[in-house]
Design a protein with these regions (language model features):
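Domain-terminus/edge residues, biased toward the C-terminal soluble/receptor-binding domains
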Residues: 153-157, 165-381
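Generic marker of residues within folded, mature protein domains
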Residues: 14, 22, 44, 71-73, ...
């Protein structure tokens, strides 16, 4: 380990000037995860990798499949999909489930179906989209599972497009959080639909069920879920002062409890932590010895701006270290990773970034290399 230079120490002294009350947090949710969008750091988790029934939160994967088909040019927002008798029977007004109130054998645009899924949680809209893209809902569900694997959602299996209870239809809070981050990052132009508070179809106006949209806390999505098996769940995201958090909770006992737990966890995440730039590529933090080079030392700096999540209190327990294999063998090319800069804090995952060389250094001449080798054997340096 190498001691960091004074410039980094000064940054830490500046950051430690923050003062607020950070405290432990608990939740009644059986499954929960709260992550920082920018860094991906987990701020809180409870059974995040335990399989659970996601109910209508599954529809986020359905939405992703549609948005990717739009991006690929396979469909357009104005394309009209057929509403089959099966879609109407299992997801329509007579089904007793969440519905967009589509008419059987009608044709509805992809754009309206998307809003029916996102805002109204319409099972009929999901099935119509699934049949239009996958030929059948089961075929579409297989596509959903395959795409989930591509995204690294190793614990997710989808048996339908709606989240209707099925013994094999499972996911985890962590997988849903990763899916949400992907949606926000790669589909910004469509993401605004998740913040729309109501949608009218067939003369019936339905309100968005996401309770955080009405809580004046910067929430702009995403999806609720509820079945008797799963309890009440929510995938939510909110942004305050340029900082975004993603929350997944499930297993609550009521709508009221879901809303209160979501507000509590999201507010805690914004109050208890801050995002800061610890170092930039302009900050040479370490001088590493060079072996058989024309210069004895090479500077090491972060490969890009090192953005970290820091608690607003308790920074005295923070440990910042730089590690690398030394000496660095010449010739050296600028920008090559040779080590890591790490930040360790109690209760949080280690945050790290590559340390890269800041200069090109040629090898020294043959005689000088021989003398360096002798010096290394005798003196170890």
């Amino acid at each position: 380990m190498e001691k960091l230079r004074l410039c980094l120490i000064f940054m830490l002294l500046f950051i430690t000037s923050f003062s607020s009350v950070a405290h432990a947090i608990e939740t009644r949710a059986t499954h929960a995860i709260l992550i920082d969008y920018e860094t991906g750091l987990v701020l809180f988790e409870q059974n995040p990798d335990t399989l659970m029934s996601p109910a209508s939160m599954s529809k986020l994967m359905t939405v992703l499949m549609v948005l990717e088909a739009l991006d690929d040019g396979r469909i357009s927002m104005s394309d009209k999909f057929f509403v089959s008798d099966d879609a109407w029977r299992r997801g329509g007004s007579k089904s007793g489930s969440s519905t967009m109130f589509l008419n059987a054998r009608s044709r509805v645009s992809v754009e309206n179906l998307l809003r029916g899924v996102i805002i109204q949680s319409g099972n009929d809209a999901c099935i119509a989209l699934a049949e239009g893209l996958g030929g059948s809902e089961l075929g579409f569900a297989e596509m959903m599972t395959e795409r989930a694997r591509d995204l690294g959602m190793e614990n997710s299996t989808f048996m339908n497009s709606t989240g209707w209870p099925d013994v094999d239809h499972k996911t985890t809070a962590r997988d849903l959080a990763y899916l949400t981050k992907h949606l926000i990052k790669h589909h910004t132009s469509s993401y605004g639909m998740f913040a729309e508070r109501s949608f009218t179809w067939n003369g019936i106006t339905q309100q968005n069920r996401n309770p955080l949209l009405y809580a004046n806390m910067g929430a702009d999505g995403l999806k609720t879920g509820h079945t008797q098996e799963s309890g009440y769940g929510l995938v939510a995201s909110a942004e305050q002062n340029g900082r975004r958090l993603i929350l997944v909770i499930n297993g609550l006992q009521s709508k009221k409890e879901r809303a209160s737990e979501a507000r509590k966890l999201m507010n805690w995440g914004f109050r208890a932590f801050t995002n800061e730039t610890l170092a930039t590529p302009d900050n040479v933090l370490v001088r590493a010895p060079v072996w058989q080079g024309e210069f004895a030392w090479v500077g090491l700096a972060p490969s890009k701006a090192f953005r970290v999540v820091l608690p607003r209190t308790g920074l005295r327990k923070m440990v910042v270290t730089a590690s690398y294999d030394k000496p660095v063998l010449a010739p050296i090319t600028k920008g090559v990773p040779v080590g890591k800069l790490r930040v360790t804090l109690p209760g949080l995952e280690t945050q790290e970034i590559d340390l890269v060389t800041t200069a090109n250094i040629e090898r020294e001449g043959m005689l000088a290399r021989a003398l360096s080798a002798i010096s290394y054997v005798i003196f170890g340096e």
